[in-house]
Amino acid sequence: MRIIMKKTTLLVILDGWGYSDSDYFNAIKNANTPTWDSIWQEFPKTLINASSLEVGLPRSQMGNSEVGHVNIGCGRVVYQELTKIDKAIEEKTFGDNKAICAAIDNVIKNDSNLHLIGLLSPGGVHSHEEHIFEMIKIAKQKGIKRLYLHAFLDGRDTPPRSAEKSIKKADKLLQDLNLGYIASVCGRYYAMDRDNRWDRVEKAYNAIVNANADFIYDSALEALEQSYARDQSDEFVIPTCIKKDGHLVKVQDNDSVIFMNFRADRAREISHAFTDESFDHFPRKKHLNINFTTLTEYDSKLKCAVAFPPEQPINTLGEVLMKNHKTQLRIAETEKYPHVTFFFNGGREEQFEGEDRILIPSPKVATYDLQPEMSAPEVTDKLVAAINSGKYDCIVCNYANSDMVGHTGNYEAAMQAIEYLDKCIARLKDAILEHDGNMFITADHGNADMMVNPETQKPHTAHTTNLVPFIYVGHKKAQVALEHGKLSDIAPTLLNVMGIAQPKEMTGKTIFNFEK
């Protein structure tokens, strides 16, 4: 039986690869990238928007991987949880939310404690501290007597040592309301792992639940100062408990815990530790009988209340490909695997018919500047094999390097990561052109394009709001058809080159026109 070889359309998402003309600590521009340079000169290209209102975020808010992949995969501007929650606060309906009211009612009924856990940060990527402050005010208004904040510290979507301002704000608010205090602090490295480093999660869980930690101090500010003295920036603060009047706070039966992060991927692991009856990733003293509420849905398998449940979009790129009987592959290493699957499919866990997935484990290193190539070699090997197989109509892949190494603030390592990616792109280009396929290269947001803040001269570990590239590599003649494009225009462009009709739910526009 003759096997029909498919001409693959490949979407390569270079996570954290923004565009900037500045060469000031720009790891992308200053790296040695002969393949990228030649592609940029030879093939049709443009720059598109990956942040702010154009991706459903508040004005001037930097984009992120979750938001980026949702917008790309859905082919429309998807208004994000941050925007929805901000709107609820603005319209004064946040305190009327059924799940939040139930968590508070549980505390009042049992004369127990309310615990808020989450990333205390103005970063706006995984959480926003203003949501936490609003929750504290609502708790006071509704009659809560004892509220304890377990603060995860950022230093990744914010400057590495910037938590003091947020801690002072939280401390002052709690003190002014005579409501409680910050009961524990820890870096997001521990509480917000997403790579199955359960030893990290265990330390955070034990500090929050059992008041069991390597360090105990009299205030959150003292804990932060001592962490800095140990040369631990915000992200890496070792889980620490705070003692007030000789008292350490534990989470007990009948308490309520509200998780204030709105982004799912880094909130899942510790949520399972709180809620799973048969949890076995590390020992717990007991399975707590608590009301556990999450701001958004982190995982459909979690047994908890959700304040802002997801709205499932229809006719995403994956669904349209399935309806047209096309085969598709999603591939990434662990750090970005949820993004090319769950987020790309608009918050859908299940695979579509005809959708295969390949997960490449991320390297087990403390920080990725220690291994800037990460798992890109293995990802590329699998990608080239998939292209050569002729099995797939469409492949979506993510390279994590420019984002994950960019987050370390290590400029030299970021350049090494970019240079390695350039070699990977060369292999993909050769394979696609050999098989008469189509390749689009883009990014979900910027990061490695600014490794040092020019104003402060300090490491810049957060995302940027710079535009991102969108390049077509293939044998078709293509012309830019859309100025000022955005991430939601990518899916319509892929459908266009594949000859598939765009559904009405996709409001994006094609970026390139192709000669028939």
Swiss-Prot record:
InterPro entries (UniProt xref): Alkaline_phosphatase_core_sf, BPG-indep_PGM_N, Metalloenzyme, PGAM_B_sf, Pgm_bpd_ind
Example of a GO cellular component annotation carried by this entry: cytosol
EC code: 5.4.2.12
Residues annotated as binding substrate: H126, R156, D157, R188, R194, R263, A264, D265, R266, K336
GO biological process entries: glucose catabolic process; glycolytic process
Gene Ontology molecular function, alphabetical: manganese ion binding; phosphoglycerate mutase activity
Substrates-to-products reaction catalysed: (2R)-2-phosphoglycerate = (2R)-3-phosphoglycerate
Binding of Mn(2+) 1, residues: D403, H407, H463
Cofactor: Mn(2+)
Classification via Pfam families: iPGM_N (PF06415), Metalloenzyme (PF01676)
Binding site for Mn(2+) 2: D15, S65, D444, H445
Keywords noted in UniProt: Glycolysis, Isomerase, Manganese, Metal-binding
Involved pathway(s): Carbohydrate degradation; glycolysis; pyruvate from D-glyceraldehyde 3-phosphate: step 3/5
Active site, UniProt feature: S65
Cofactor-binding details, from the entry: Binds 2 manganese ions per subunit.
Gene3D superfamilies attached to this UniProt entry: Alkaline Phosphatase, subunit A (3.40.720.10), BPG-independent phosphoglycerate mutase, domain B (3.40.1450.10)
Record-stated family: Belongs to the BPG-independent phosphoglycerate mutase family.
Subunit-level organization: Monomer.
Physiological role: Catalyzes the interconversion of 2-phosphoglycerate and 3-phosphoglycerate.
UniProt xrefs under PANTHER family: 2,3-BISPHOSPHOGLYCERATE-INDEPENDENT PHOSPHOGLYCERATE MUTASE (PTHR31637:SF0)
Protein name: 2,3-bisphosphoglycerate-independent phosphoglycerate mutase
Organism: Francisella tularensis subsp. holarctica (strain OSU18)
